[in-house]
Swiss-Prot record:
<comment type="function">
    <text>Self assemble to form an icosahedral capsid.</text>
</comment>
<feature type="region of interest" description="Disordered">
    <location>
        <begin position="658"/>
        <end position="679"/>
    </location>
</feature>
<dbReference type="Pfam" id="PF02956">
    <property type="entry name" value="TT_ORF1"/>
</dbReference>
<keyword id="KW-0167">Capsid protein</keyword>
<protein>
    <recommendedName>
        <fullName>Capsid protein</fullName>
    </recommendedName>
</protein>
<keyword id="KW-0946">Virion</keyword>
<dbReference type="InterPro" id="IPR004219">
    <property type="entry name" value="TTvirus_Unk"/>
</dbReference>
<keyword id="KW-1140">T=1 icosahedral capsid protein</keyword>
<comment type="similarity">
    <text>Belongs to the anelloviridae capsid protein family.</text>
</comment>
<dbReference type="GO" id="GO:0039615">
    <property type="term" value="C:T=1 icosahedral viral capsid"/>
</dbReference>
Amino acid sequence: MPWWPWRRWRRWRRRRGNWRRRVAPRRYRRTARRARRRRKAVRRRRRRRVRRRGYYRRYRRRRRYKRRLLILKQWQPTTNLRLTVKGLIPVVVMGKGKTQNNFGQWEQTVPLEGESYGGSFTIRKFTLQTLYEDYLKLRNRWSRSNTDLELIRYTGLNLRLYRHEFSDYIVHYSLETPMEVGLESHMLAHPLKMIMSSKHVTVPSLLTKKGGRRYLRLKIPPPKLMMTQWYFQKEFCQVGLVLLSISTATLMHPWMAPFVNSPALTIYAVNHKTYSDMSILPSNNQGSTKNELIETLYTAEHTYNPMAQRIWGNIKPQNTNFTPENYWNKWNEIHTKIKTNRQSELTQLKQMRKRLELTTENDYQDPNFGLSYGLYSPLLLYPEMYFPEQSKVYQKARYNPLLDQGIGNVVWTEPLTKKTCDYASQAYNVIKDAPLYLALFGYIDICSKLAKDKSFYLSNRVCVKCPYTVPQLLSKTNATLGHVILSENFMRGLVPSKDSYVPLYMRGKWYPSIYHQEEVIEAIVSSGPFVPRDQITKSLDITIGCRFGFRIGGNLLNPKQVGDPCKQPTHPLPAPGGGDLLRAVQVSDPRKVGIQFHPWDLRRGMLSTSSIKRMLQDSDDDESIEFPPKAWPGDPVPVGRTLEERCSSSLYHLLQEQATPPPFKKPRTEDQEENPEETTQLQLFQELQRQRELQLQLKRGFRGLVEEMIKSHRHLALDPYLK
C-alpha cells in the first residue's frame, strides 16, 4: 500500500531550505487552425475548489505476478546473545636477518641462543580456534562465556591498524574460500605486489608521516560463501573467518638503502664445470669415486688464498715460509700433507663422537666431505684470493635487482643425492619467469611446509638460473642447467650464525644445503624494492587491534531456585567471581562445546537417563599440553587437500583407506616346535582383535556419515571448503 494515506495533514505544505517563486515559462502560441464544428454542450459537475481534508489521492493498482524465488528464513534460537572478542595480536615480530621468513610459521618455535626470531611478513588465517588460543595467551577478552550455548553465528570484524614508530607495513585481506596457501602465495605477500594489488591498506609509520591519527580502521565482512545461519561451535571452530596478509615495507627508501653506494650485490655459485658430480653419495653411476674429483680440485692454483696462509702450520713442509714460490714449487709435499690431515681429521672426529656417545648405527662419515680438507672446504671456496686472475672452483657474479625482468629466471629445489643441478628431472617447487628477489621471498618457508620433512633444510639445496647477472648464471649448451648459490660464511667455514664453532655432526658432512644457503637468499631478498632493509633497531614488532562479532545462541536450563541473600557465604576479598582474576569470563575450547544439558533433559526436576549417558559417552579427558605444538591453526594449510582431510574426524575414519597389516611373526623359542597350536591360537587372537578395531572404526565412520546426512537435510551442514 502506498505511503501517502498516512502522511500528516497540513494546511500548507512546508517548504524546506531557501526557495523563491518560480517564474512561469513563456507560453508557446501555435498558429491558428481552421474553425471546426462546435460540440454539443454537456452539463458536468463543477470541480471542488477547496481541497478535501484527509485521504484524497488515488493510486494505480499494480498487476500481481507469481514470485520466481522464495526467501528461506530460519527461526532464531530461544537464547540469542551478542558475543564480542576484543584483543591485541602481534602480527609481525622480526629480528635482524629475517626478511625472507614468514612469521606465521616461526611463531611457535624457540630460537637457539644468538639466533634471530620471526619474519618480516605473515599470512594468518583467523578462526574461532585461533581466538581461543589467543585467549589462553591473554591476548583477547570475551564479552561472555561460550560454555552454556553451543550455536554460533559470525557477523564481521573490525581492525585497528596501529602505526609503528619507524616501520611501514601493508595489509591485504582475502575472503575467498578455501583459505589455503600455495607455492606462489608468498610471492603475493611481497610489499611490491601488495602495493600493486587492488585491495590493500598502507599504514605509514610515524617517521614517514608525522602527525595524524595513531591508527587506521578497517572493517571486514564475513567470507563470501558463508551463509547467515546458525552453526555448532564444534564444527565452526575450524572455519576460516578471514585470511590476513601483512608485510613490512620501506616507503621512504624503496629502491636502495641510504647507506650503500649501489643496489647490486655479489652472488657466489658453484662452478658446474669443475664440480661434475655434486651428489653426496660415495660414487656416481659411472663408477668414478669422489677421490678422483677431489684430486682434480686440489691444485696449487685453487688453494693459494688467505685460508692456506692461516693453516700453513699444518700443511707446510719443514723450514718453509709461506711465499708463492715455495707454495708452487713444493706443492707435492703440501698435497701429501693435506691428504694425511684429511684422514686424521676423520679419525679424530669418529673418536670424539664415540666418547660423547653421539655415534649411531647409520652414522656414515665421508672423508671427502670434511670441513677442513673436503670438496667444499674453505681451502677451496675462500671468497678472497691473493690474485684475482687465479682459476677458481666457484663462480662470482654481480646482480642488480633493478634490471631483473624475471623472464628466463628459474628457481627450484632438489635433493642432495642428485648429481647435476638441472630442473629436467628430480626438481621440486619450480618457479619460472619471476624476478629473483620476488621468487625467493618466503620461498624456503613454503617449500618446507609443502615437503613436511623435518630434515628438509639439511637434505635439499636451492638451485638458480638467472640471465640478469654478470656473468650470467646459466649454461649456453644446456638450457635446464642451473647453479647452486653459496653464502660467504659457508665458504669461510662458518655456520650461518657466524660462529666459529661447527657442530661435530656437521664437520664430516660439510656440503652446500638450504641450511647454509639462507644467508645468500636473505641478501637477494633484501635487495628487492620496498623491503625493510634499513632498520633503525635490531628488531621490530607490529600490533593490530581486532574486534570479532558473533551471535551465540541455544537453550539454557531453567533458572535455579532463588535463595536467601542474607544466608549466602562470604569470602575474604569481595572480588566479583572470586576465582581466576586473570580470566573473569569462563571460555571453553569451541571444539568441545555442545555436550551441556538443555531444558528438555530435565524430567520432574531431575536429569534424564539419556542425557547422563550422552555426557558420559561424549566427555573427553583433559589433554596434556604439548610443547612446542606440532601445528599452529593460524598458519593456513597448503593447497591440494583431499576430501578425507576436509571432512570431520568421525567421517574421516570411514573414507580413509585401510592399511594391510604386516604378517604376524613370533620370535623363535625352544617350545615353538613343540606347541604349534599355541602359535596358531595367538595368531587367531590377534587377527580377531584387529577385526574388532576395524569394526569400531567403521562404526565411528557410519555414525559420522549419518550425522552429516541429518545435518544436510536440516540445512545445518557446513561447507567443507570453508575449513
